[in-house]
Regions:
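Conserved radical SAM core fold
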Residues: 53-58, 95-98, 190-196
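Alpha-helix-loop-beta-strand connector modules within alpha/beta enzyme cores
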Residues: 37-54, 111-121, 149-153, 208-213
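Helix C-cap/helix->beta junction micro-motif
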Residues: 14, 43-44, 84, 123-124, ...
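Hydrophobic faces of well-ordered beta-strands that scaffold small-molecule active sites
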Residues: 16-20, 47-51, 89-91, 128-130, ...
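Acidic-and-aromatic substrate-binding clefts and catalytic sites of carbohydrate-active enzymes
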Residues: 1-6, 21-35, 57-61, 65, ...
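Histidine-acidic metal/acid-base catalytic patches
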Residues: 5-9, 87, 140-143, 147-157, ...
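N-terminal pre-domain/capping segments
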Residues: 1-82, 249-250
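Active-site acidic/histidine proton-transfer and metal-coordination neighborhood
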Residues: 64-157
Length: 250
């Protein structure tokens, strides 16, 4: 959807779950959160919220005021998400486009803030899902560190972005199995292993069958979210929603 008003076409055709980006369409069209939700108020499916990305960084070790401000914004986002009845809010543990000047200190700062946010989320009865973000030297956590994050913080859950994991060369099926019941959602999209293209499933170089097998092995409930580029035709999105359902039911 290139424009926010185009979502009516989707809402008319889709009654399943939705993930709402708080940065707006294309991540660059600021919206009034309270006004914007009115268009989704009557939607029958479950709602998940993707909290803002830009200008926020829970891991800022050089400037504590940035990480503290980011915490306050995300706390407000959790409260808003709970207010509209969302079941889950997705958060990035760091600003993935920012170089890590002090990696260990940045990890500690992010973990401390995620612990605080997890406590808020628990009180609000909303799932706080932490996504794997950042590529190569810009990634705050590697694969093993990402798994340990959820061992250290019991009040958060894991969202595995399959496309991000592919670019970083992670063992995505193994990661899914290692996380087990701590996995609450997956972002499904494809790429060429180099750029974060958000292509439809099958449009890149990801080997999907091992991922489907790993997801089918999970016995708990989790969200399967198509996170395709905004210019993907609605017909493709709906077709692939059915494809995912078929694959996971095999």
């Amino acid at each position: 959807m290139k424009r926010i008003d185009d979502c009516k076409e989707l809402l008319d055709a889709w009654s399943g779950g939705l993930e709402l980006p708080m940065d707006g369409p294309n991540w660059d069209e600021p919206v009034n959160w309270h006004e914007e939700f009115k268009r989704f108020k009557g939607h029958k499916g479950p709602i998940s919220v993707h909290s803002p990305i830009w200008e926020l960084n829970l891991a800022s070790a050089r400037f504590e005021m940035i990480s503290q401000y980011s915490y306050e914004v995300y706390k407000e986002c959790l409260e808003w998400s709970a207010h509209i009845g969302a079941e889950q809010m997705v958060v990035h543990p760091s600003l993935y486009s920012t170089r890590l000047f002090m990696r260990e200190q940045s990890q500690r700062r992010s973990i401390d803030n995620l612990k605080r946010l997890g406590e808020v989320a628990q009180k609000l009865r909303i799932d706080l899902a932490v996504e794997n973000v950042g590529f190569h030297e810009f990634a705050l956590f590697d694969e093993d560190e990402f798994v340990r994050l959820f061992e250290e913080i019991p009040t958060i859950s894991a969202l595995v972005d399959v496309g991000h994991a592919h670019i970083n060369g992670w063992d995505t099926p193994g990661l899914i199995r290692r996380l087990g019941e701590r996995l609450s959602a997956v972002h499904l999209h494809d790429n060429d292993g180099i750029d974060d293209l958000h292509l439809p499933i099958g449009g890149g170089t990801i080997e999907w069958e091992p991922i489907w097998e790993a997801l089918r092995s999970q016995k708990h409930a989790y969200r399967s979210i198509l996170e395709y580029d905004f210019d993907t035709p609605l017909a493709t999105v709906l077709e692939h929603a059915s494809l995912v359902k078929r694959e996971l039911r095999k």
